[in-house]
Amino acid sequence: MLILTKVNIYMLIIVLWLYGHNFIMSESQCPMINDDSFTLKRKYQIDSAESTIKMDKKRIKFQNRAKMVKEINQTIRVAQTHYETLKLGYIKFKRMIRTTTLEDIAPSIPNNQKTYKLFSDISAIGKASQNPSKMVYALLLYMFPNLFGDDHRFIRYRMHPMSKIKHKIFSPFKLNLIRILVEERFYNNECRSNKWRIIGTQVDKMLIAESDKYTIDARYRLRPIYRIKGKSEEDTLFIKQMVEQCVTSQELVEKVLKILFRDLFKSGEYKAYRYDDDVENGFIGLDTLKLNIVHDIVEPCMPVRRPVAKILCKEMVNKYFENPLHIIGKNLQECIDFVSE
């Protein structure tokens, strides 16, 4: 008679379990089995093609987001090297003007008038500042005036965003200059990385509080990227790539105008131009071919019917030529008043 030890008992249990498992598996493969047992399986196989398309869309969306975050991180790393180089250059520049004047060295500086005005303006903001966080906020207003326009696109910007998908980051290269100015004004030119991080967090809180007062108006909203379609696949891809960089339709219009009419903005001749000829007011009409390109890019991205989109697009073009907000220095007094409060 077989004596069942503990080991034998355990082995017997395992054998019986395996036998039962194999029996169940073999029954599940039997063609006579009731179809009801496959209800769940059939449920998820009915729309297999549709499921594949959805998975592909999710995969592409994830890849695009991953690419975006990678590019942002790469820009931040490059900006760190830029900060160190810019700070050395700034300190040398300040030493230079101790023994001479800006007027004397201006001829050797590219775009000397713009450089002179920039340095003069940011110096005035710095001298009036009593608080590092308010100084940073005022310099953001000064250096990014287009973000604080009627479309309120600043709502989507942060210095240190919690989510790099939900919020955009201000240009790290301009932030480097702001950081250098703050370190000069309050920290005797010492590099204060931790302090800068704290200041950035405080400024983000100020941006959040200001953002709560506004919303992006419907006329400035953009279609979801997957709903944008151009005249061809190539056009669609190009338009989507431009839209990925924008928060509002006004920003998209500005980007296209700065590309197509670069010379007018660079020379300052833009002041004499509008969408249509206006002889009474002395305005010259813009190139029709280039305006058609603006419409072809912008209209598919607006969540309204094409006739309405065309009218809104024309309004935004005229608005930008009346007051191109990318040109800094127009709001100097506003910035000084802000830091003086």
Curated annotation (Swiss-Prot):
Membrane topology: Single-pass membrane protein
Keyword Transmembrane helix assigned: yes
Function: Major early protein present in virus factories. The presence of BEN domains suggests a possible role in organization of viral DNA during replication or transcription. Plays an essential role in the inhibition of the cGAS-dependent type I IFN induction in host dendritic cells. Mechanistically, abolishes cGAMP production by triggering host CGAS degradation via a proteasome-dependent mechanism.
Keyword set, alphabetical order: Early protein, Host cytoplasm, Host nucleus, Host-virus interaction, Inhibition of host innate immune response by virus, Inhibition of host RLR pathway by virus, Membrane, Repeat, Transmembrane, Transmembrane helix, Viral immunoevasion
BP term (GO), one: symbiont-mediated suppression of host innate immune response
Cellular localization per UniProt: Host cytoplasm; Host nucleus; Membrane
BEN domain: residues covered: 112-222, 233-328
Record organism: Vaccinia virus (strain Dairen I) (VACV)
Name of the encoding gene: OPG067
Predominant cellular place of this UniProt entry's protein: host cell
Annotated GO MF terms: DNA binding
Protein name: Protein OPG067
Known partners and oligomeric status: Interacts with host CGAS; this interaction inhibits CGAS-mediated type I interferon response.
Keyword Transmembrane helix appears in the UniProt entry: yes
PROSITE patterns: BEN
Family the entry assigns: Belongs to the orthopoxvirus OPG067 family.
GO-annotated cellular components: host cell cytoplasm; host cell nucleus; membrane
Induction comment: Expressed in the early phase of the viral replicative cycle.
Residue ranges of the TM segments: 7-25
